[in-house]
Design a protein with these regions (language model features):
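Membrane-embedded alpha-helical bundles that constitute the cytochrome b-like, heme-associated redox core
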Residues: 1-235
Length: 235
């Protein structure tokens, strides 16, 4: 029995490279990732100082103060990186694949096929852009959580440091106290948002690896190289 191959029919497959994430987008991704990990660790220490320095009669060991200071610095780095990341999403030419992903949110068929692919009952649909609808929605919600944790964090900062930048922040964001019903609620919301990140990070890492294994077209390393691969037929 003779079968017709791709060579017989004159069809060949080519691997095409597409720039999916620009250099600055990738850089900001890793900046925010490292800041989030550090903020979670240092935040837990601020809430419950589980390490104590050696006892000293002189006020020269300020472990909690240093930890809080670096926590605040990392928080402002996260705020700056997040603002710049939003700017890149809307205006950077290299972020066009991300903006294109938005329109698939309106397609229920793509939604159904995407969920089916994660449940192993359907093939992953061909998507236009960087994200499928489930990914886009997840990252959008994560952006809202980032906004919440930054606003509550700035409010907590202003209630500790009353001069300089803290005074400016207090004048600009004192309304958060009233909206949340007091500083205790602001702190509670800040902690709840932290737990959202704690849950998200391992799930995100797992799904990135899962997608890379099941669909080896540059999933995991796309945030390193920025390149996504696709097969195209050439007659």
């Amino acid at each position: 029995m003779v079968t017709r191959t791709e060579i017989d029919t004159g069809i060949a497959k080519e691997i095409q490279q597409h720039l999916e994430f620009g250099a600055m987008t990738r850089f900001l991704h890793w900046v925010r990732a490292f800041m989030i990990v550090f903020l979670v660790a240092s935040g837990f220490y601020i809430a419950y100082p589980f390490l104590q320095p050696d006892a000293s009669g002189e006020p020269v060991i300020f472990l909690q103060a240093y930890n809080r200071a670096f926590h605040c610095i990392a928080g402002f780095v996260l705020i700056a990186a997040s603002i710049f990341r939003v700017y890149l999403f809307f205006f950077a030419p290299s972020s066009k694949p991300e903006r294109t992903s938005f329109w698939q949110l309106l397609n229920p068929l793509v939604w159904a096929k995407t969920i089916g692919a994660y449940l192993f009952i359907a093939k992953h649909p061909h998507i236009k852009g960087a994200y499928n609808p489930l990914q886009f929605t997840t990252y959008f919600v994560l952006g809202l959580v980032t906004l919440i944790i930054c606003l509550t964090g700035v409010n907590l900062y202003a209630n500790v440091y009353h001069d300089g930048l803290g005074g400016i922040m207090g004048a600009c964001f004192s309304w958060i106290d009233s909206v949340c019903g007091g500083l205790a609620n602001v702190r509670a919301i800040h902690h709840i948002a932290t737990w959202v990140f704690i849950v998200f990070v391992p799930v995100h890492i797992y799904l990135v690896i899962w997608n890379s294994v099941r669909y080896p077209n540059g999933g995991a390393d796309a945030m390193v190289s920025g390149i996504r691969y696709s097969e195209e037929q050439r007659v």
